[in-house]
Amino acid sequence: MRSDWLDPAILDHVLAALTPENELALRVSLATGLRIDDVLHIKSQQVERGQRFTVTERKTGKKRRIYIPELLYSAMLRQSGRYFVWENRVDPKRPRTRQAVWKDLKRAAKLFRVSDSLNITPHTARKVYAVEAFAKYGRVDRVRDLLNHGDEGTTALYLMAEALTARKLKGRPQLRGR
């Protein structure tokens, strides 16, 4: 099932209900457009070198230079473990799993009663990033480069995420009242 786009203001509320570590991971994903697995595999050494560094995407093997904004950067430094910024709870030599972040996000989305018809996952942050980048730059090719997509068609799907979510909801609010 595809992940859905979520209004950034509502996503902010949902992120506030996560554990601090998972909230930080998703905020880094929102700021950089990285997949959650790539965020979780950021090593402490990389962050200690500065706010700008290169990440090798785990899904595609492509290299990508990213910049971490100051607030997120200092939070990453504070929480950084010996090997990874997001350490695994059992083995510090391994990163936190994307499933752990997924589970926490699902719990928070349920807590905030985000519509049952929406599939909110860590990939939602990447879709929000894409929609915001398109609003800022207005060019599909620019967003494609930011997401490191090989095909503009893939990027177009991300850019349509907001409209697809609106169609899916058909006038229903994203947050349900009691």
Located regions from the model:
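DNA/chromatin major-groove-contacting recognition/catalytic segments
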Residues: 1, 67-71, 160-178
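DNA breakage-rejoining catalytic core of tyrosine-based enzymes
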Residues: 1-11, 61-70, 82
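Basic, Lys/Arg- and aromatic-enriched nucleic-acid-binding interface segment
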Residues: 4-32, 36
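Short, basic (Lys/Arg/His-rich) helix/loop patches that form interaction surfaces
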Residues: 16, 103-141, 145
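Alpha-helix N-cap/helix-start motif at helix boundaries, enriched for small hydrophobics
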Residues: 25, 37-41, 143
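Conserved tyrosine-mediated DNA breakage-rejoining catalytic core shared by Y-recombinases
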Residues: 41-74
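Short, polar N-cap/turn motifs at the start of nucleic acid-interacting alpha helices
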Residues: 47-50, 139-159
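Major-groove DNA-contacting interfaces characterized by cationic-aromatic clusters
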Residues: 73-104
